[in-house]
Amino acid sequence: LFIDLKHSTNLRTTAKELDVPERRFVRFLIERRFVYRTASGNVLPYANVKNAGLFCVKDYYNHGHIGSYTLVTPQGKLYFAQLREMILLVS
């Protein structure tokens, strides 16, 4: 596994770093209540103690559109790397 511990990365890049399928990774995060999917389809972390330091949310404004996206912090990447085998078991 190659995990960049200097930068926070989006869910897709984090899944690639962990060598797990992106959809399976997101499904794991949703099932384990680390994140939830908004009505608009965004994936955002729950604000709870379990998630402290694992994620950060960035807001953006682009051509009149305002939105948010979730990044996994280096601490979060290490945490999910330890759960990699469990993530791979998600159907």
Roles of regions detected by a PLM:
Residues F2, K6-R12, K16-S91:
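Positively charged, aromatic-accented nucleic-acid-binding surfaces
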